[in-house]
Amino acid sequence: MQPQPPKTTNVPTPARHHAGKTLATLAFALALPHTTAALAQQATPQPQQDTPYQAAHKGGTLRLVASTSGGTLDPQINYSGKYINLFAVVYDGLTTFKKVQGPEGNSVVPDLAENLPTPQDGGLTYIFTLRQGIRFSNGQPVTTADVSASLRRIFKVGSPTAGSFYSAIVGADLCLKTPATCTLKGGVEENPAQRTITIHLVRPDTEFLQKLAFTHAVIVPANTPEHDVGNTPIPSTGPYRLTKYDPNTTLSLDRNPFFKEWSAIAQPQGYPDTIEYSFGIPDEAAVTAVENGQYDFMADVIPMDRLGELGNRYTAQTHVRPHAAMYFLPMNVNIPPFNNVKARQAVNYAVSRKAMVIFYGGPGIARPLCGMVPSSLPAATNFCFYTKGASPTASALQWQAPDLAKARQLVQESGTAGQKVTLITANTSVDMAMGGWVRDMLQNIGYQASIRPISNTLSMTYVQNTANKVQISLTTWSADYPSPSNFLDDLLGCENFHPNSDSSINIPGFCNKQVQSLMDKAKTDTTLTPTQTEDLWRQADRLVMAQSPIAPLIERDTVVLTSARLGNFFYTTVNQLFFSQVWVR
């Protein structure tokens, strides 16, 4: 899951890189590990027991702040964590993730459907029964026609996950080829009299219910325009509705007047009366504003140089929570210099994952990552090819130190030494600090390297589009739901590479038949035990890292800063701070 900028061709002028500032920042950061470790220990209590709704805390305005907006309001297109987590209190799908704290939040539960169906026909057929009496925020009843239209709309609007999540539906192949004429004929059948929706698959999908729980499969009215609605809100089913949006300044939500709670674990009634999201406040200023109570929550990553202050003075307002997320360097395997595997391996050897940990805030909230699967997920990476003394044929158990000599040797062997390389980063404090270090590293191993910071609002779609000829970039990714497929298949699956598109999350343009075969078997073979499935993902992980289309850097926890007045801090494993359940009065 990544920031989804508004579509635009206006890219800021590259900023000048100052190596001295990078070194000074790293020197400062060396003092942080003990502080952040203490912060993690102090600020991470055990999840609270979920309690019945407490009407005394109903009301008030929840005030959120971010440096930039998150792009389109279209829930079937937006792929930013910033808005996906917000949309969780606005929209609903047939299924959802359980709205409880702790590991149980990874469980799928029925949402607009009455119950979870048992797959039939060897995992090829799912029959859902729609709940009665649910209305959209415009008063319109939710019908089976809305469900069918919403599933077709995933393909018609070019949802970023249309291919990776929903291509198993019968008829999806034609929809992916010609979205405008998508019908999903034979794939989606409705029976209005029985309130049932039947979905047929061409192959089993062991994670299909999880994919239906993801935001891109939410149910919207059948007459919703079949294109990106941009800044125009779509009627919704959840406890809140989107009311006003200016991407430069504000996003406003208020209560959905037609919402009546049907399941507290699927979509609980909310506490705040309104939610106000303010944009244009830089991350440094946002920290101060939340500390002072001007806002209740900041969406941006907390700058490294403020973590010590939070650990010393604001521990009650600072919350460290696990989240399957990583920083990484995708390298374009189709253009020089990284169309050479040795050049890509050189980057993996040369990068100091310890430095990246420090730039993010220290070992209390981040850890080196050698492969594609963070430690909180099944089939977590358990090897390290690219550390001093190791190789793809003689792996280590964990990362120890960079090997610059090996990296320089590989650059020379690749014949790419001296080539110009431009690193694209977002212009946030953390990304700029990391990016500055990576630029210096690229220079050190033999390239003419420069850094090009781009607005955080634009960077993610920019690096996805092959027309921009991005060689290497620094970006982040977090799980849409708890599965290794979210990192291996999403980021490197052949079906997720779409040249000349802003929606091509396979940024390296990597496609390997052997890797894809392993991933497809892990996703579709319902006869496998969990252990056997994990083994397939681990095999894919090792094959991927031997080819090095990506240099994983760190896995990171989430550090959440809230105001002193915010009560009932409610964190779910999938949607993080769950906005409807916090108290502001």
Where would I find each of the regions flagged by the language model?
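Alpha-helical secondary-structure segments
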Residues: R63, T143-R152, Q194-H200, P204, ...
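Gly/Pro-rich hinge or "lid" segments in bacterial periplasmic/extracellular proteins
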Residues: K98-P103, L184, H200, P204-G270, ...
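Long beta-strand-rich cores associated with HINT superfamily self-processing modules
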Residues: V560-R585
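N-terminal lobe/hinge region of extracytoplasmic solute-binding protein
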Residues: P47, V65-D121, P235
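Extracellular/periplasmic solute-recognition and catalytic clefts
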Residues: A168, T243-D254, E276-I335, I358-F359
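Extracytoplasmic/peripheral linker and loop segments enriched in polar/acidic and small residues
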Residues: Q48-D50, A55, V188-E190, V357-Y360, ...
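Structural transition elements
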Residues: Y240, G364-L410, V430-A433, L528
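Surface-exposed binding/hinge segments that line
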Residues: T129, S148, K156-P221, K244-D246
